[in-house]
Amino acid sequence: MAQHEVNYLKSGGLPVVLTTVDHLVNWGRSNSLWALTYGLACCAIEMMASGAGRYDFDRFGTIFRASPRQADVMIVAGTLTKKHAEFIRRLYDQMSEPKWVISMGSCANTGGMFNTYATVQGCDRIIPVDVYLPGCAPRPETLQYAVMVLQQKIRREKASRKLPPKRLV
């Protein structure tokens, strides 16, 4: 049986489902992503458009949340300054495990065209990133694709993999 295959057997006339706990847990996690939006610049406009009726993020099971305690995906969209770095780290730490991060746009990925002393050259220097979304500014369809890539990544991992990292003091 493949890792994510569900088999249906006939047992006395009743269907029986054979699968793994990892498959069931990851299926639930991947189809109910609650996103904490952290929009900082132009990419935030495209991120907001993805939640509107035309693109309808809800059909992927993605719901935008305003609180990090209710979210399991953080979408960082736009230029990250050094003043925001501590704040974004605090928001990330407040999210419960398992948690994932999507870096949206060239500015969030690499600092974009703003190579200054006040700009963080990629949000992966502050928080771990799972999916990088290139472009300036990426279209809502691209953000939907990034969510689907994240869903595939979640379905492949072990349900017990996401343990809190050891903190270095």
UniProtKB/Swiss-Prot annotation:
Q: Which cofactor names does the annotation list? A: [4Fe-4S] cluster
Provide the membrane topology annotation: Peripheral membrane protein
Q: How is the cofactor bound?
A: Binds 1 [4Fe-4S] cluster.
Q: Name one GO biological process term.
A: aerobic respiration
Record bears the keyword Cell inner membrane: yes
The family database entries (NCBIfam families) matched by this protein are listed as: nuoB_fam, PRK06411.1
Q: What is its main location?
A: membrane
Q: Name the GO cellular-component terms.
A: plasma membrane; respiratory chain complex I
User: InterPro entries from the xrefs?
Assistant: NADH_UbQ_OxRdtase-like_20kDa, NADH_UQ_OxRdtase_20Kd_su
Keyword annotations: 4Fe-4S, Cell inner membrane, Cell membrane, Iron, Iron-sulfur, Membrane, Metal-binding, NAD, Quinone, Translocase, Transport, Ubiquinone
Query: Where does the source fall among the domains of life?
Result: Bacteria
Q: Where does [4Fe-4S] cluster bind?
A: 42-43, 107, 136
Q: What is this protein called?
A: NADH-quinone oxidoreductase subunit B
Translocase is among the record's keywords: yes
- Quote the catalytic activity from the record: a quinone + NADH + 5 H(+)(in) = a quinol + NAD(+) + 4 H(+)(out)
Question: What is the annotated quaternary arrangement, including any partners?
Answer: NDH-1 is composed of 14 different subunits. Subunits NuoB, C, D, E, F, and G constitute the peripheral sector of the complex.
UniProt family annotation = Belongs to the complex I 20 kDa subunit family.
EC number(s) reported in the record: 7.1.1.-
TM spans (from-to): none
**What is one Pfam family matched by this protein?**
Oxidored_q6
EC class: translocase
The free-text function statement in the UniProt record for this protein reads: NDH-1 shuttles electrons from NADH, via FMN and iron-sulfur (Fe-S) centers, to quinones in the respiratory chain. The immediate electron acceptor for the enzyme in this species is believed to be ubiquinone. Couples the redox reaction to proton translocation (for every two electrons transferred, four hydrogen ions are translocated across the cytoplasmic membrane), and thus conserves the redox energy in a proton gradient.
Which SUPFAM superfamilies does this entry report, sorted A to Z? Answer: HydA/Nqo6-like (SSF56770)
Q: Which source organism does the UniProt entry give?
A: Wolinella succinogenes (strain ATCC 29543 / DSM 1740 / CCUG 13145 / JCM 31913 / LMG 7466 / NCTC 11488 / FDC 602W) (Vibrio succinogenes)
Location in or out of the cell? Cell inner membrane
